[in-house]
């Protein structure tokens, strides 16, 4: 049984700063990211576990005919603004590390973190930006647990 009390430093899979989206998707297909958790557990309104499986194998991508592409595009465009608002309202220092990480033991576990927060005590925390409404929280909480 694995030791669940240990902490691990994540390893860098790839620098994502100038990575084209299609290449980013290829790296993402190598493992399971936070966005995949709800589909795996069968609670995602956007994809089933089979959709995800096919996407990972590049058989077919459930993202090809997305009906929610507008929400995703707007959400992506608003991420920096929401992070700035968070910074102004909390006073916490925020910063980005444009890299995709993986777990050193469970190498299939991937993370692409939106922002990091430097807390007043010097510790680092994760800021995952979601531009949605409160009623949709059940659709994204699993991705946060994955991190």
Regions found by a protein language model. Name each.
Residues 77, 81, 108-110, 122:
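Residues forming well-ordered secondary-structure scaffolds
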């Amino acid at each position: 049984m694995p030791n669940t009390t240990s902490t691990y430093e994540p390893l860098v899979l790839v620098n994502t700063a100038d990575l084209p989206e299609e290449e980013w998707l290829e790296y993402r297909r190598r493992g399971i990211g936070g966005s995949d958790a709800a589909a795996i557990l069968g609670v995602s309104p956007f994809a089933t576990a089979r959709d995800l499986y096919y996407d990972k194998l590049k058989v077919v991508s459930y993202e090809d005919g997305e009906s929610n592409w507008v929400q995703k595009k707007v959400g992506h465009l608003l991420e920096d603004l929401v992070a700035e608002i968070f910074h102004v309202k909390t006073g916490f220092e925020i910063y980005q590390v444009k890299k995709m990480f993986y777990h050193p033991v469970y190498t299939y576990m991937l993370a692409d973190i939106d922002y990091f927060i430097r807390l007043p005590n010097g510790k680092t925390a994760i800021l995952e930006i979601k531009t949605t409404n409160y009623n949709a929280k059940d659709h994204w909480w699993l991705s946060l647990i994955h991190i």
